[in-house]
Amino acid sequence: MVRLAAELLLLLGLLLLTLHITVLRGSGAADGPDAAAGNASQAQLQNNLNVGSDTTSETSFSLSKEAPREHLDHQAAHQPFPRPRFRQETGHPSLQRDFPRSFLLDLPNFPDLSKADINGQNPNIQVTIEVVDGPDSEADKDQHPENKPSWSVPSPDWRAWWQRSLSLARANSGDQDYKYDSTSDDSNFLNPPRGWDHTAPGHRTFETKDQPEYDSTDGEGDWSLWSVCSVTCGNGNQKRTRSCGYACTATESRTCDRPNCPGIEDTFRTAATEVSLLAGSEEFNATKLFEVDTDSCERWMSCKSEFLKKYMHKVMNDLPSCPCSYPTEVAYSTADIFDRIKRKDFRWKDASGPKEKLEIYKPTARYCIRSMLSLESTTLAAQHCCYGDNMQLITRGKGAGTPNLISTEFSAELHYKVDVLPWIICKGDWSRYNEARPPNNGQKCTESPSDEDYIKQFQEAREY
């Protein structure tokens, strides 16, 4: 009640003062008895206003559109516009002077105050301005009090942005799960089984939360996910990497078998049909061709059909040359090896597995490789190369590799009939077999074995 009474008294005093000044200006009698009495009344009202202002120093009121224009004109004309002091009213959060949204009132933007004189006395009136936050309300960031620092105080919007930034950073750089599959069957004699350094079977999930890129204890990080298979059909390979220390990255690869490429059977259908005549079919059986009293191996060697001549010519021109040393990359997966004679890359794969039976068909060989078919191939043949314990190419003798007229990649059955069965017919006499299927040494590698060992092997084959 005291506060309301003080405000009413203040408003009444201002109204009377305004009316009095208006009357004085209209009459023009500034030195008469009435003027003296008016001056006394004005002094009395001014004293009352000062008393009321002292007792209600914390009183504030809101400027509204309904305030009389004369009151605003008089206030602006005789009093300097005060620097705004902002208070927190009950239920209405008003901005304090220290907040980044505080601003100075721009008089030209207010029609009622545009002509105000701000050089008069200040009646010590406090003005509370309420600013409602909204998308269209922006603070004046260019004006700051003299004693304020150049940076602004964090606002709730800034805090929300910081939380969103932290969540995005965590999503991009941390808390990633890596699936590790240790049950894949892709190991061979040069590649230890996958997961040898992890004892838990099946799938494991590695969490990299709050860890550096690599483990400082053993110098190895977690394996990345396997890459996409390098081919969409046929035989390809996949790779994955992990950190092994500073400026060190370990790479691991494995084979991935996709469905056969469409069209390869159609591409080689004619050749497969013609070659099947040599292997045996309902119309022609190679084993029945030879009589009991004839040398079957000799008959096989002397069979020189026009198709076979043309086919062998294509084989010699189509197949790559054997590398002089065993390419160790084929032990892990199929590999592309550049052929300097053909001037292009050829895909190779390891052929040293148990099913190759090297101890029977290639007794002195330790490793063998076989070229792979491609859509550019004009035949179904594959180059077959074998290597000794020193990983050097065996160019002659019983351990040397010979071209396969039918690749096992196309048909294992036809390969057996065309390439393996003649060796059986010749009773393992590699000297005659290699005469019909000479080993490849297109890159002019060092002859192996030595002349002495080769002559010894040749004599043993003849005596057998």
Curated annotation (Swiss-Prot):
Descriptive protein name: Isthmin-1
Pfam families given in the database record: AMOP, TSP_1
SUPFAM superfamilies linked to this entry: TSP-1 type 1 repeat
Domain AMOP: 289-452
GO cellular component terms, A-Z: extracellular region
PANTHER family, per database record: ISTHMIN-1 (PTHR10239:SF30), ISTHMIN-2 (PTHR10239)
Glycosylation sites: N39
Family per record: Belongs to the isthmin family.
Signal sequence range: 1-29
Name of the gene encoding the protein in the UniProt record: ISM1
Biological role: Acts as an angiogenesis inhibitor.
Single GO biological process annotation from the record: negative regulation of angiogenesis
Subunit note: Interacts with integrin ITGAV/ITGB5.
Biased composition (Polar residues): 51-63
Domain notes: The C-terminal AMOP domain plays an important role in the anti-angiogenic function of ISM1.
Segments forming domain TSP type-1: 218-262
Keywords, comma-separated and alphabetical: Disulfide bond, Glycoprotein, Secreted, Signal
